[in-house]
């Protein structure tokens, strides 16, 4: 159903949202703009506003009861791509699987990929996300060249190492508190291979897991673990997965990343 948002004369849909960890639900007002002018209007009109990415934060990071959340799912376009200089500018609502499906066609990518393909690019910037090779590649900050944000008091701001650097640093990992992330320019890196050799090793504890992962952080290998947290006597036991790029296997064909659906099972007690 629809309700009139108390601070404007516009119609805003009211929906119930639940956090990814299933611990919090709330009725919120939501709008999905498709024009830059709408971003300005909604930001100025609402007293309490939160920018929403894909909504996959474990906590309720992008919504609160009776507040207005602006979803950026329609801002999902490639604005500029420079293959020669390995640079791309995308809107913040673009999903990771869309970004990779585009860049991998040109044998380019960003390795700091969160664990789910539907996470938004702006959401990854707002949390300074990392991938499965973070010991080697670091966080997504290492490949960000520029950011455009909109702030209700300061207006449109361009951020980089050379322009508004302090706000640039605060925006990456700032959970949107410096303003709404509109678009991001990345430095891309070469993608070395399209096949991987995967190994699985048993881990006996959380400490054992940390040690084994640290031993593999000085390479481009993807290393991650699944650890049980529901057993007091065997806390942290699980498995370590390692994916090594197979440079001997060459393929000119890029397999598209599918839009998958995550099925949440509340009975699982794994940390990834």
Question: For the regions a protein language model found, what residue spans apply to each?
Answer:
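C-terminal substrate-binding/cap subdomain adjacent to the FAD-binding core in PCMH-type
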Residues: 126, 145-272
């Amino acid at each position: 159903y629809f309700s009139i948002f108390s601070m404007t004369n516009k119609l805003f849909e009211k929906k119930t949202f639940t956090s990814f960890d299933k611990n919090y639900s709330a009725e919120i007002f939501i709008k999905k703009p498709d024009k830059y002018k709408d971003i300005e209007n909604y930001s100025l009109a609402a007293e309490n506003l939160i920018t929403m990415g894909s909504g996959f934060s474990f906590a309720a990071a992008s919504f609160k009861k009776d507040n207005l959340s602006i979803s950026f799912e329609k801002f999902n376009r490639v604005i500029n791509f420079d293959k020669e200089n390995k640079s791309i500018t995308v809107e913040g609502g673009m999903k990771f699987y869309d970004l990779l499906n585009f860049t991998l066609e040109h044998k380019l990518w960003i390795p700091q990929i969160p664990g789910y393909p539907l996470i938004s690019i702006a959401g990854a910037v707002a949390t300074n996300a990392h991938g499965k090779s973070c010991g080697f590649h670091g966080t997504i900050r290492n490949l960000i060249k520029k950011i455009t944000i909109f702030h209700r008091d300061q207006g449109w701001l361009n951020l980089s190492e050379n322009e508004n650097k302090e706000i640039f640093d605060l925006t990456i990992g700032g959970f949107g508190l410096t303003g709404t992330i509109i678009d991001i320019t990345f430095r891309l890196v070469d993608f070395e291979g399209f096949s991987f050799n995967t190994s699985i090793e048993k881990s006996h504890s959380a400490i054992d897991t940390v040690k084994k992962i640290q031993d593999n952080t000085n390479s481009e290998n993807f290393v991650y673990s699944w650890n049980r947290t529901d057993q007091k006597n065997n806390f942290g036991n699980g498995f370590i997965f390692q994916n090594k790029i197979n440079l001997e296997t060459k393929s000119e064909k890029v397999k598209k990343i599918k839009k998958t659906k995550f099925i949440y099972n509340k009975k699982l007690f794994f940390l990834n």
